[in-house]
């Protein structure tokens, strides 16, 4: 199973719709998502299909986690014996939410990549039209045991490695990236983060949302480079 989050534009979004047969498609309507509460409601209404946690406990991070962790039952209900492929499309071009809320929403999506990694093939597409010149940069969820394979796959690229095991503060995380990578080379960049549990629930959510925002908006969107980020668990 694999999980990825890819930056695309609206033209690529149109092409994406041509290849969705047999997949569970979740579309998040940014026009209806003004804050993180709206986002939580939108994503929960899509994935909470087993025990209806949202009505038992309300719409929050913990209900979202509990609903997502029912991945085995979700596969049986929606796919049976067929391959379980899920596509989430979120057009976030207008950046309506506050920066803090956007960071939390990215943390939700990254957590889903980890929680569903053993049962479902998850492809997340964030649509950011007219906000970057370079598209198809992405975040890939993988296992730490595959680190050597990743090195071989990405050789001859600008590779940066960072272990997050002792990293609990977003400020430290951001400073280490800014100090070690200037994104001035023309070659593709590959960022590898070991022990990426901080993005799921390893640290305070306010720190995690700042880290997630750094990866998606500051790096994937604003650097205008072809970038691939591996979050290893």
Predicted regions and their residues:
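N-terminal intrinsically disordered, low-complexity segments enriched in P/E/S/T
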Residues: 1-55, 59, 63, 71-233
